[in-house]
């Protein structure tokens, strides 16, 4: 590779994720985005369970049955001279841990809001995570083909609830059955909407200028006048787009449209490729690593099992932070202090995997993992580095898991430890007995674990309720005090899947008492990988 080519390759990359509340239309948007990137020719819209066209980005058996995206997949496609990497994050109620970690691997996010509902609780939680790194956010107000709330009201809500300034880029003309299109504030153009074009890219029907009589003819006098009145208000009351404020995560450009009707998606893609940052530098324990550096570095943010039902394989997803991956490269697996030759890394088009010949900073590659790679691992070309900031969250829900067939205890433990390494669930083994406690951030994770134990490890397991309120990782620098703490609290201590000591609290009162009683012991709600 010529040295001149490298900065050009990195600068054309855009790596982003979509964040939304369940059912705000995220999977549909993913489909339409890929359609624009020509990755798929007709968008397989996510329909009911019986339909054979399942969404292209949902690919685990259980996802197909339920019509939700459970695992984060990665898709790369070209758009406007850029190469876009889209990380699909599970939007459903519970898949939070995986989703949170995915947000550590992107340089910008698209926030999708259901315009009939406004800002919802899951969106608030995800926005908090993007705030940790001030990730730039673009906003798409979706579902304009339905009856929606007043657009000004939606902008106010985003500003007040999510504490970010809004700069409308497009503005809707009507909504529901009367939805006619959007006006672009910065190009002074109106884009007209046609129904029934959801599966293909619409022909652009553009009217130049706000005072153009063609506009009145196309949308009707009333709506045209309403648009002009609203725009006067908007231009007086809202923020102008400011690139620096956007890059610092203080302001979000807002686009209106309908993903199902495939309208408005290209508007935010244009914004993404024009404004969103190219791959950024990242903090490691000893220094910051710039994306312009020639030596390869990267970190693993997710592990996924069985992307290929024919093989019991697991793939570790690695975000390339700097340098270039080339087939057959020797990389240092820093945590293990081992050098490995990576000859068969993967690139992704969800579920269709192709072997990567090369990848640059900003790209995501898949490494085959036979149980040696963990979330948070760093790979380099020899430098002893560890990237920081990839979190594990204390679970909020707990159940005891046991076998229908007690002879399969070994398989059960193996399955649970593997699933916990993958971040699907957390496992705790109490020091006092042989129980296995499963901890999750949401209820759906429990179902996923049982169905995967059955299909991948041939183990039938059932849950029982258990009296656990929360868990905290514990550490103490004073060995003597720690020993006393361990001796007196043995009945509440457990090891997690990575053999880290954890305090399992039956009630919050119990936890508070323990924290008061042992001020030298640190109780952690999150743990960095």
Curated annotation (Swiss-Prot):
Gene3D superfamilies: P-loop containing nucleotide triphosphate hydrolases, Peptide chain release factor 3, domain III
Keywords per UniProt: Cytoplasm, GTP-binding, Nucleotide-binding, Protein biosynthesis
Subcellular location: Cytoplasm
Keyword Disulfide bond attributed: no
Cellular component annotations (GO), alphabetically ordered: cytosol
Leader sequence residues: none
GO function terms (MF aspect): GTP binding; GTPase activity; guanosine tetraphosphate binding; translation release factor activity, codon nonspecific; translation release factor activity, codon specific
Binding site for GTP: 20-27, 88-92, 142-145
Domain tr-type G residue range list: 11-280
UniProt record, GO biological process: regulation of translational termination
SUPFAM superfamilies: EF-G C-terminal domain-like (SSF54980), P-loop containing nucleoside triphosphate hydrolases (SSF52540), Translation proteins (SSF50447)
HAMAP family listed in its UniProt record: Rel_fac_3 (MF_00072)
Identification of the protein by name: Peptide chain release factor 3
Native species: Pasteurella multocida (strain Pm70)
Encoding gene (name): prfC
């Amino acid at each position: 590779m010529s040295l001149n080519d490298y900065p050009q390759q990195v600068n054309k990359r855009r790596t982003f994720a979509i964040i939304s509340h369940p059912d705000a239309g995220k999977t549909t948007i993913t489909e339409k985005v890929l359609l624009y990137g020509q990755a798929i020719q007709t968008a397989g819209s996510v329909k009911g369970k019986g339909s054979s066209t399942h969404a292209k980005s949902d690919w685990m058996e259980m996802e197909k049955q339920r019509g939700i995206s459970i695992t984060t997949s990665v898709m790369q496609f070209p758009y406007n001279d850029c190469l876009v990497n889209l990380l699909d994050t599970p939007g459903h109620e519970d898949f939070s841990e995986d989703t949170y970690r995915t947000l550590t691997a992107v340089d910008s996010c698209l926030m999708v809001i259901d315009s009939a509902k406004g800002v919802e609780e899951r969106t608030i939680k995800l926005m908090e995570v993007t705030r940790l790194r001030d990730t730039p956010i673009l906003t798409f107000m979706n579902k304009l083909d339905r009856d929606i709330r007043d657009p000004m009201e939606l902008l106010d809500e985003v500003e007040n609830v999510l504490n970010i300034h809004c700069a409308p880029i497009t503005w809707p003309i009507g909504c529901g059955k009367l939805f006619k299109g959007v006006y672009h504030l910065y190009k002074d153009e109106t884009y007209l909407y046609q129904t029934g074009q959801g599966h293909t890219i619409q022909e652009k029907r553009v009217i130049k200028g706000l005072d153009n009589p063609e506009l009145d003819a196309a949308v009707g006098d009333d709506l045209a006048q309403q648009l002009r009145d609203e725009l006067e208000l908007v231009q007086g009351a809202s923020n102008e787009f400011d690139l620096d404020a956007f890059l610092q995560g203080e302001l979000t450009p807002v686009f209106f449209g309908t993903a199902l009707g495939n309208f408005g998606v290209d508007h935010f893609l244009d914004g993404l490729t024009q404004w969103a940052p190219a791959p950024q530098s990242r903090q490691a324990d000893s220094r910051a690593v710039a994306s312009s550096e020639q030596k390869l570095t990267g970190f693993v943010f997710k592990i996924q099992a069985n992307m290929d039902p024919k093989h019991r394989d697991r793939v570790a997803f690695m975000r390339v932070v700097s340098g270039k991956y080339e087939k057959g490269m020797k990389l240092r697996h820093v945590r293990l202090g081992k050098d490995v030759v990576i000859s068969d890394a993967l690139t992704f088009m969800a579920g269709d995997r192709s072997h990567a010949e090369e990848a640059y900073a900003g790209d995501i590659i898949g490494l085959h993992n036979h149980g040696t790679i963990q979330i948070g691992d760093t790979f380099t070309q020899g430098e002893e580095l560890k990237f920081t900031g990839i979190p594990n969250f204390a679970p909020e829900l707990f159940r005891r898991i046991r076998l229908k067939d007690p002879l399969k205890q070994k398989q059960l433990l193996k399955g649970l430890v593997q699933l916990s390494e993958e971040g699907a669930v957390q496992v705790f083994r109490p020091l006092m007995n042989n129980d296995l406690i499963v901890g999750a951030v949401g209820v759906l994770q429990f179902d996923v674990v049982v169905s995967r134990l059955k299909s991948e490890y041939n183990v039938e397991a059932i849950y029982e309720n258990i009296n656990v309120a929360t868990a905290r990782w514990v550490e103490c620098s004073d060995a003597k005090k720690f020993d006393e703490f361990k001796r007196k609290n043995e009945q509440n201590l457990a090891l997690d899947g990575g053999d880290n000591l954890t305090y399992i609290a039956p009630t919050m009162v119990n936890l508070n008492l323990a924290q008061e009683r042992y001020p030298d012991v640190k109780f952690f709600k999150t743990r960095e990988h």
